[in-house]
Amino acid sequence: MAISRAAHRLSVEGRPVFHMEFGQPSTGAPPRAIAAAHARLDSEAGGYWESPALRERIAALYRDRHGLAIDADRILLTCGASPALALAIAGLFCPGDRIAFVRPGYVAYRNAVAALGRVPVEIGADATTRYQIDARHIEALDEAPAGLIVASPANPTGSMIDAAGLAALAATAARRGVRIIADEIYHGLDYGAPAHSMLEFDPDAIVINSFSKYWSMPGWRLGWIVAPPGTADHLRAYVGSLYLTPPTLSQHAALVAMDETDVLEGYRETYRRNRAHLLDTLPQLGLGRIAPPDGAFYIWADVGDYTRDSMAFCQKLLAETGVAIAPGIDFDPVEGHHFVRFSFAVSEDRAQAAMVRFGDWLGRQARPYAKNTRRSTPS
């Protein structure tokens, strides 16, 4: 967040800024979804409402993508994935419960777990597991946690867990009495094999998702949670106390957006081209140690030849070039001092221009740690 605030200040001053620190699509909502919202503004007052049609359409998504029969009554609409995560933690875990997640990982996991009175348990991962959690991590814990947050594709790495890995995680979690929260917010944004839902392997998993990423609707604040069987009514009691319903306009727009496949796949192709450009450019600049970006829109790169202070590295880069990237310390307080995250959810011309500036700048930086060698990340 410090880099984002600094980038905003530069923008206010009139400096050109290349926002590669945000996990926010630059593509915008599908045009027909926006038109649907306009039409509703002209015809409705817009009261509290939860769309039955949208819940049914989300259930159909699981059928079509994953071959799963999900009762629409198990789907609760939320004001984005972050409230869905808070709802899962508050509604299905007790104060003092230990909830585990991988490091590097999305900073909100640690913050949400702690803020809600549960105990964060960080599990370090590295290139040997593609920066992902696997069943061996859970087996190795002396005390099994009450919960485990799994993200595939993941933020900040973009790495995914394949079907065998998810199945092993589900089996190990079940054996040790661990309830899984699956953050599937980046589903749809994959560049090889499609992502599997944890529900394919654990029918009792808590699954959260959002319209912010694949559907390119971050500001519309709409997501959902698939509640485990028998828990939906319990969670709805929390919803009624927290936010009643998500924004009505967003629900109308999202229902249209879900069928805008050609537009959405066009967005994904933009990210795919940006990804290819960064994967070609960064190794040429000497940054070849990166996590495998199977999905999402991130590159997690080791800049350890240049720095042991990723925040200072990113601050200097921003001040001297206008290129904003995220310091690894935001995602991994232990090893993140020599990593950075690039977001390629920007337009193609901005991605290319940013890489030119970054490359010119990097070429002028000293490499005081270049003699330290590390194993390259497996593909």
Outline where the language-model segments fall:
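Active-site PLP attachment segment
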Residues: 201-234, 246-249, 338
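Conserved glycine-rich beta-strand-loop-beta hairpin in the small C-terminal domain of fold type I
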Residues: 255, 271-282, 290-303
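N-terminal small-domain helix-loop-helix segment of the aminotransferase-like
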Residues: 1-80, 87, 257-258, 277, ...
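PLP-dependent enzyme catalytic core of the Aspartate aminotransferase-like
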Residues: 316-325, 331-379
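Structural motif of enzymes handling amino- and sulfur-group chemistry
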Residues: 229, 246-260, 266-267
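Structural signature of PLP-dependent enzymes
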Residues: 235-240, 257-280
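Active-site phosphate-binding strand-loop segment of PLP-dependent enzymes
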Residues: 127-193
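PLP-dependent aminotransferase-like
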Residues: 91-151, 171
